[in-house]
A protein has these predicted regions:
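Generic secondary-structure signature for well-ordered alpha-helical cores
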Residues: 14, 18-21, 59-67, 111-119, ...
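Active-site histidine-anchored catalytic micro-motif
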Residues: 38-42, 46-53, 57-79, 102
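Structural motif
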Residues: 28-31, 160
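N-terminal glycine-/serine-/threonine-rich phosphate-binding loop
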Residues: 1-28, 48-61
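Glycine-rich beta-strand-to-loop/alpha-helix junction loops that act as flexible
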Residues: 30-35, 72
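Ligand-binding beta-strand-loop-alpha-helix segment within the catalytic cores
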Residues: 65-127, 132
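Solvent-exposed alpha-helices and their adjacent loops that cap or buttress functional pockets
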Residues: 20-22, 102, 148-153
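Glycine-rich, aromatic-bearing surface loops/beta-hairpins
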Residues: 108, 112-180
Length: 180
């Protein structure tokens, strides 16, 4: 099962990367309920081992493309973000070290696995994966656009995805760059 979780995680972020047209330096916010991944209700059966496989799949892909992960903590840490300092080198950090029952298993794995992890109260990511209905919208740039993935399951959890685009301004006579 571990290899399957790794592969599903890798496939989901890979598909999002292509659809969202992410590029080097982009940030992808990840919300994850490992309880949902293992077939339980969110918040009831956290799995540190499952989180490890998810993190490896996501991080291996992210490193290969030069993008950054921003892992959303659970509500006990007010949905703070764990990311790498290089993603936002001048951001104001907060002092917390996530734990499986205070921050979540994936955030804990990320804190241990990132090269130079930092915690932030908030972030504005370019795209996002919501694994198991964790609600990541507060950490996406405006304007969020839903993305339907073919790879929409990790274990038993439903995977929802979003990309972002620049706001359209200017009204009826304005011209827009569809690549943004």
């Amino acid at each position: 099962m571990d290899r399957i979780i790794y592969e599903q995680s890798y496939a989901a972020i890979s598909e999002l990367y292509e659809i969202a047209k992410l590029r080097e330096g982009s940030i992808v916010v990840i919300g994850c309920s490992t309880s949902e991944v293992v077939g339980s209700t969110i918040g009831t059966n956290s799995s540190f081992e499952t989180a490890g496989e998810i993190f490896k799949g996501l991080y291996d892909f992210a490193k290969s493309k030069g993008i950054y992960l921003a892992i959303q903590c659970c509500e006990h840490l007010n949905r703070a973000i764990i990311t790498e300092r290089a993603a936002l080198p001048f951001a104001e950090i907060v002092n917390v070290v996530p734990q499986p029952k205070a921050g979540g298993s994936l955030a804990t794995q990320a804190y241990a696995g990132f090269e130079e992890p930092v915690a932030l109260e908030e972030i504005k990511a370019d795209a996002g994966l919501d694994i198991g209905f964790t609600l990541i919208g507060m950490h996406l740039k405006k304007v969020a656009v839903p993305v339907r993935l073919k790879n929409n399951k990790i274990g038993s959890a439903t995977v929802l995805a979003a990309r972002t685009r620049a706001k359209y301004i200017g009204g009826a006579r304005a011209m827009y760059n569809e690549e943004q």
